């Protein structure tokens, strides 16, 4: 029996499973392996057969994960850059409606990095265009609180 090609198996894995695998590696502080897998995850977004909505999710979440790894290793500048790269996605049905993941942003706010988080939110508003009044008010409240030096309650956006 022939051993399956690891890269072929990886390419067939659903996005949510790859993300969950990297999350487990981060929780176990397997930084180098998590960084390697997150890099492969990001490359998956560049594949021509990758559908558009998944491409946006992959770009967003891979950069989020790479930023969390960088921050855990003490590289704040790289973490800030990864946050901004996460915001440069064209979006997806999920990101466009539920909004961006804010876990890395929260961690950077805890490190006193308000400006990069405000810039990230501006980038996210390009794809997060849902116009329901409660969401508009929530986004405005986040910006207000960040400008006041507070850390907003990002609620479910910490786990999307």
Provide a role label for each language-model segment.
Residues 16, 59-61, 99, 119:
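Residue register of alpha-helical TPR repeats
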Residues 3-10, 43-56, 89-93:
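Flexible helix-coil transition and linker loops at the boundaries of alpha-helical arrays
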